[in-house]
Amino acid sequence: MGIKDWPDGEGPREKLLKLGVGPLSDAELLAVVLRNGVQGLSAVELARNLIGQFGGLRELLTASEIEVCRMPGMGPVKFAQLQAAAELSKRISQQNLKRGKILSDPDLTRDYLMRQLADRAYEVFAILLLDSQHRVIQFVELFRGTIDSASVYPRDVVCLVLEKKAAAVIVCHNHPSGVAEPSLADRRITERLKFALETIDVSLLDHMVVGDREIVSFAERGWID
């Protein structure tokens, strides 16, 4: 059953237009994106099955085409609809943290980093460069692969900071395992970077470790001071 076949006022699209997006469940919002269900399943039921099968919206939206198209009723067209919705969400997040934006909201930073790094199958070490008023200069991915104290070079970080004339930075990396808890190696890297940045009078504001569903902040744990 497609959304257009729902009785007047009962479909998720009509509910959205009447009440706004807030009252809609994840399955109802996804049904609006999918538009149609399959034989024996409404669009909402199909959406609910997809979310349940993949374990959540983020897992569904980051799944491969092969994984999604294995599901009954899902093909290349519906996969493209999901990818478009996911990309729009990511681009909105990028615009919220665009160059010149004053970084005063920790939740905004968390949301941005989660969207950038949480779905990576490999480790990425990145840096958010800020000016003296904590306005965004640039987000740069520096290293990929196994991130440990031997693979992150403070010299490269310092060179980038000097090149971009940054006054403060937030470093971050993801854990593909999904567990955000920092390792001993993560803490060692942070200490080395903090020392290197202090030599050029640049502040290390935070080191954030991104997992599947959470971000651990070194600053919040008191590990930066």
Swiss-Prot record:
One of its GO terms (molecular function) is metal ion binding. Residues 102-224 form the MPN domain. The keyword RNA-binding does not apply. Zn(2+) binds at residues 173, 175, 186. Keywords: Hydrolase, Metal-binding, Metalloprotease, Protease, Zinc. This is UPF0758 protein Ssed_0385. The keyword Hydrolase applies. PROSITE patterns: MPN, UPF0758. A motif (JAMM motif) lies at residues 173-186. It comes from Shewanella sediminis (strain HAW-EB3). It comes from the Bacteria. The lineage of its organism: Bacteria, Pseudomonadati, Pseudomonadota, Gammaproteobacteria, Alteromonadales. One of its GO terms (biological process) is proteolysis. It holds the Pfam family RadC. Belongs to the UPF0758 family.
